[in-house]
Each structure stands twice: as structure tokens, then as C-alpha cells.
């Protein structure tokens, strides 16, 4: 799963750089998010204690509140925009937004209207909407993909766990123009697939 999320981060950055060079490299993720235990996945994650070992965090990976109505009672989409402004992030600099379908063992979901507005905002900004479906995908929430509860279609889906019934396999799914940013073989390592 972490490797799939790393690939999602790489695709977002590459996508942004194709559009606007190094002016469009910011990745927005959410407080309390967990995207894995590798370097990039932990920087994208929203749990500060898991980042203590990382000496130099990437300043272009930022977290905003996750609107679950519990830890963050403010579920307005405007909070997303206000948070970016507070962090000094210009909308046009955002290459991608990565979110889990739900957070944690208690399955905290965002309101569907929030996610629908986020989808529209990403489209307007030419930023990729990336769903980390490692925990929620393959029927775990009652739909094949967890994001189906929101009535949106992401640009990139990072998935694992349920894909293989326990084998260490993950996948990244996306539109052709995103997935073709790298030629075959260039996103793999010694023992991974392509």
C-alpha cells in the first residue's frame, strides 16, 4: 500500500511539473491520515508522531483538517480553502490532493458534499484527486471502491490489501494521460511489477 501511495505522489508531482514546472508541486493531504511507512508516504501522512525520524520534511507536502465532524467539527469545504491560505499555499501550486476514503479504525468519513466540492476544485486547478483505497477498496465499505459513496471519480486510485487476499500486492489505477507520464519499466524496482 505504501508503495502504491508513493507512486501516487510521484504521479501528482510529475503531472504538476508538466503543467507549470516547479511552480506546481504541492501535495495536499489530511490531518490524521495514514498512507504507509515509507519516507514519502509518511511525509504525506497526517500523524506528526510518525514523522519524528524524518529530519527534513518536504515543505511542499502539507496537511489540512479532515472534515469528519468528530475530530474536526467544521465540515465546510471552505475550511479546506482557508487552511491552504493559512499555510501560504496558492491553489495554482497544488499538483494533487491525496485522501483516504475514510480515516482510522472507526471509519470517519467526510461529508459527500465536501468531497464533491473537492473534486470540482481539483478539476478547476488541474490538480489530481488521489484516493488511497488501500484500506477501503474491494468491497470493504459495501461498494467496490470506497470513493463511490461520495459520487466522484478520482484521477488516481492507490489500492492494496484486499486486491490479493493477503499477498503483498498493490496497484495504482488512473487515466491514461496520467499513467503514461512514465514509460513502461520506469516506475518499478528489482522485484516489483509494472
Region annotations inferred by a language model:
Residues 1-194:
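Conserved N-terminal phosphate-binding loop of PLP-dependent enzymes in the Aspartate aminotransferase
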